[in-house]
Amino acid sequence: WNSKWFDVALEESSEVKVGDRIVRIVSAPFFVALKVEAFEDRGEGDFISSTDFEDISCLFNGREAIVDEIASSERLRGFLAGKFAAYLLQPELEDAVEGFVQTEDDPDLRKRLVLGRFRAVANLMTVAGQA
């Protein structure tokens, strides 16, 4: 699997000591970009059965700052905005997100929150076009 973002994500990753090991942590925007590529490659764009898209949905569900983090990433903003704009046009997207947030206390609220964050990223296309 070839990712156009992997090498850059690794270069810009941070090192964290876990026990007696050092692990590399990529930023949330790079994690999303890598998951988007995996979703479209091995997940074949199947929103409902893709574990990569489930990971994306979970990140958008649980990370309040994700939109701001992506907006701040000059390198990834346009790429991710375009992808999410296209995803929002797919009718099965809402069903997939709904399935991924079913374990939450208020699944409908979480679904709306995730979709709202997807829309906010898609709306960054305007910002990316002006950058």
Please place each PLM-identified region on the residue numbering.
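Compositionally biased terminal segments of proteins
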Residues: 1-131
